């Protein structure tokens, strides 16, 4: 399994089982609110981005009431600060590239906190465009391994634009060009297969291997970013090994 697919699978399992569900659901609620505002409709049948975020929410067992509240907030019901999306680019120890995607109601506060995490952990915040050229946005869909086979899934998703399928013990990870996300999910649902997760993810064109000590420092920074309330996603070009995941 590739480093990216391995890491995506680990993060998916963590989201499904993490004891800190409240923080995960809070982040997804922001994504739902933004999806409604940007997609222009609270109806997932008319809003592809919202439809995909709801798939992600259900994959973490987010209660329907929480999902509905976030949709209403995005549609203008209730109070709530304006949430903005932005990205920060930088370097971690060993020259590893990192992109941090955030959804925040206070970009000055968030920028200062992101900069602090970089600087206090051997990294540095860079200007926009410094590392983003090393990544492409991809559709990544997770399917339960139980009851499915690689061959049967290939027959379903290749015509929908998927490029690759990889498997670990519990899930199949399907990847394809960013614009194929909805078509892959729709093709699976048409065959009665419910994805556990479906989202657009930044994937590095090439990964890099560095000294294990530096790699552990990079994993620490990634963990700090992922624990930040405003961070929605973290991408890196570090080659994620089994040893690092087990740490």
Swiss-Prot record:
Transmembrane segments: none annotated. Gene3D superfamilies: 1.10.10.200, 3.30.70.980. GO terms for molecular function: DNA binding. Residues 1-22 are annotated as: Disordered. Its main location: cytoplasm. It is found in: Cytoplasm. The lineage of its organism: Bacteria, Pseudomonadati, Spirochaetota, Spirochaetia, Brachyspirales. This is Probable transcriptional regulatory protein BHWA1_01533. Keywords: Cytoplasm, DNA-binding, Transcription, Transcription regulation. Pfam families: TACO1_YebC_N, Transcrip_reg. The keyword Lipid biosynthesis does not apply. The keyword Mitochondrion does not apply. InterPro entries: Integrase-like_N, TACO1_YebC-like_2nd/3rd_dom, TACO1_YebC_N, Transcrip_reg_TACO1-like, Transcrip_reg_TACO1-like_dom3, YebC-like. One of its GO terms (biological process) is regulation of DNA-templated transcription. Belongs to the TACO1 family. One of its GO terms (cellular component) is cytosol.
């Amino acid at each position: 399994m590739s480093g990216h697919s391995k890491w995506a699978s680990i993060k998916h399992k963590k989201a499904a089982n993490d004891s800190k569900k409240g923080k995960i659901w809070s982040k997804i609620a922001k994504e739902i609110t933004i999806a409604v505002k940007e997609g222009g409709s609270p109806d997932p049948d008319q809003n592809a981005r919202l439809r995909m975020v709801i798939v992600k929410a259900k994959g973490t067992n987010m209660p329907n009431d929480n999902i509905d509240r976030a949709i209403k907030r995005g549609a203008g019901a209730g109070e709530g600060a304006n949430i903005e999306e932005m990205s920060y680019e930088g370097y971690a120890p060993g020259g590893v590239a990192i992109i941090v995607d955030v959804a925040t109601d206070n970009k000055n506060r968030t920028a200062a906190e992101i900069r602090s995490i970089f600087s206090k952990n051997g990294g540095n915040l860079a200007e926009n465009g410094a590392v983003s050229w090393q990544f492409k946005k991809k559709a990544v869909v997770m399917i339960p391994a139980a009851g499915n086979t690689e061959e049967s899934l290939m027959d379903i998703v290749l015509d929908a634009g998927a490029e690759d399928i990889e498997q670990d013990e519990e899930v199949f990870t399907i990847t394809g060009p960013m614009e194929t996300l909805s078509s892959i999910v729709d093709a699976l649902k048409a065959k009665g297969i419910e994805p556990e997760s479906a989202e657009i993810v930044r994937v590095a064109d090439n990964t890099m291997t560095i000294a294990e000590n530096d790699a552990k420092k990079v994993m620490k920074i990634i963990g700090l970013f992922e624990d930040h309330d405003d961070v929605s996603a973290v991408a890196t070009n570090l080659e994620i090994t089994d040893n690092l995941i087990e740490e």
